[in-house]
Amino acid sequence: TQVSIGKVNLGFFNRIIIDDVMMLDQKGDSMICASRVSAKLDFLPLKDGKISVSSAQLFGLNANIYKQDAKSPMNIQFVLDSLASKDTTRHTPLDLHIGSLIIRHGAVAYNQRDIAPEPGVFSPQHLGITDLSAHIILGHLTDKDIHLAVKKIALKDKSGLQLRNLRFKLDADQQQALLRDFSIELPHSQLQFD
């Protein structure tokens, strides 16, 4: 696949900033573009097999995701497969921390191409998300548990759905899940619970 990068800037020791990123899918269609991707990494946890990102930003995201039908893979599947371990005989445990993930000015399109879209009707087979803005803290993600705080997610969908703010905290393991401080705000309604 083709990947192009406009500019790479290495900050103090552990920060990387990449401007004007574009990746095509295997058919040559635009798959992922971003005006800026930035991350600040913590190297000390790597010695213990942990991945720690103190902050990450994704600005001007434009993602075009599709699949031909319900049974075919998404056009991004080859990227996910390339990230998977080639050694299937042993398992490397996942241990990930992201102190702060900020997404601004994002757009995500998802389409299942064998189903015709209905204008003005929300459909999980045809998402047209714009004005995506998010602030997420991934306290801890392992094979066994997750500790996640969604400070804010806001977006608009082409169907007319407008999510002004979604926030919650999630703590889950293999036995139970606890959802706290949940709040969702739409243009004319709001729901929240502790």
Language model features with spans:
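Right-handed parallel beta-helix
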Residues: 94, 152, 157-169
